């Protein structure tokens, strides 16, 4: 797998050079790239653009980018697309390579004021203080397919610096295969490369090879893709963040896309024990875009067992969510995840966990949007659920392992999005969390079973 990692990185560089050489003319009329059009979702949820024609070639997006846009487009309500953010760099001349990104930072006030300043299960705002979460840079050469050019090659590299780096690290990439630090020595701020892949497109097929975001789940580690500052428990504990391997997408029609891929487990590039996993799924969005249905499943020897971290046991997890537009202003998203892992302990028992998340959004006007979220994560064996961040507290006091609390944890969040212009968004929220299990308390430095927080962050796109 070490050889595989270096081949992937070399392939990304080579294909970027090849893509640059292939470029003949700039992509006319681009103000910004549609991969990060959450601003459309934040302002009356614009519909997807019309299908491409022979006279206007389709610029294909990477799979993860297309997934993020589908989330936005499935929340359609206006006939006009929201304005794109102005770009500091944007497209590099005639190369078709785009450089974009954003800054994301915010603060959280915890009603308990824990001495450690850690907010228990909250993420990514896990500190009771200001955090610079993401300096996120995207270097991308999108695919461009038309009748005269049925195939193309591109790629994408994402770089993230900030406190969110720990949620996107991959074993054997940013860390050593055993999980010990390699790129980053601290527990607060660090650098990660959550995506680095080559994209090969032919007609309706799109093959991504390298490291990429998972197709499971509704929320994303990219701040611009989410309504709330804090993330749901499913993304925090159950779902993978990235995979290393290959993912094939078949766009059967404008309504249906199919996915299948082979990966080296989850959040792993080169582990002590490498394992093969399969991911597959689909996205269905009818022409009227009244609703959208996403389903994805992952299976294989994906996670180390509780009994021995060097032994990987069979694990299966699925994620599905339904987006439904009641009107142009009201939208609902319902998500269900479930997972099973065999031989998680010395007795050979099977662990299971599941989650349910419900969202309700209301578009007030072009600048304001309100949202509610209820979140439930149930982990009867305590294989996933836990409190604090990896590492040690100031003064040398160790933090507990991030799992081991059996039971269910729930939260209710209410928030607003204020988008005065396409380049800036403010996300205030209030959140109540409570734990109903029999393990160690999750909040206020493991002394309480509930907590109340107020948080707000700002996103500046460039």
Locations of regions flagged by a protein language model:
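Short loop/turn motifs that connect adjacent beta-strands in outer-membrane beta-barrel proteins
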Residues: 83-99, 143-153, 204, 216, ...
